[in-house]
Amino acid sequence: MKNSFFSKFTPKEPKFFPLLKQLSDVLSASSVLLVESMEHDLPTERADYYKQIKDMEREGDRLTHLIFDELSTTFITPFDREDIHDLASCMDDVIDGINSSAKRIVIYNPRPISESGKELSRLIHEEAINIGKAMDELETFRKNPKPLRDYCTQLHDIENQADDVYELFITKLFEEEKDCIELIKIKEIMHELEKTTDAAEHVRENIKKPDRKVFIKAEQDTWNY
């Protein structure tokens, strides 16, 4: 009993980094499935990919809740517990967005996915890759923050690309699509994909929080000196 009590006050930093990395791995795997699903037009094939993505989404939920549980029972965390909470939650939101996009494709069963839709899925995958790389740097960013900051910059650039792809496509969609039902289907799917790229941007914002706080603390220490 004594050991159990005092263990809460013992540094347990390492466990959060592997859990966050595992969550980013699930995100990356989900994004790969999304990209692959865009190349298939048969309803049965789309449904099969959605099932696989749904399994990934459930695993993402499991890891996210595990991180939350660990936060509630750990006294010392590697950085602010609310930042760990928000980072995990935002990564889970991206996985949820991928799942929602795949779900809409199955439900609406649109014509072959446009090149713009495929491009958005590829950009989501690029965001997932950069998030995974950022998670690799999270444990050591205090010693060398540059790689983490570089990945955050790349995430921001990718999200801007996604905005451009989405806005151009929607403009053309309303100009050229004459089938109102098909227009609604495609717009819903594209909107969900674009929302998912936005969710990845929120991950970037939460990755930056610990770095920003460390920087401010260093500046304050300099002033105090």
Where is each model-derived feature located?
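Cytosolic, long alpha-helical scaffolding segments
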Residues: M1-Y225
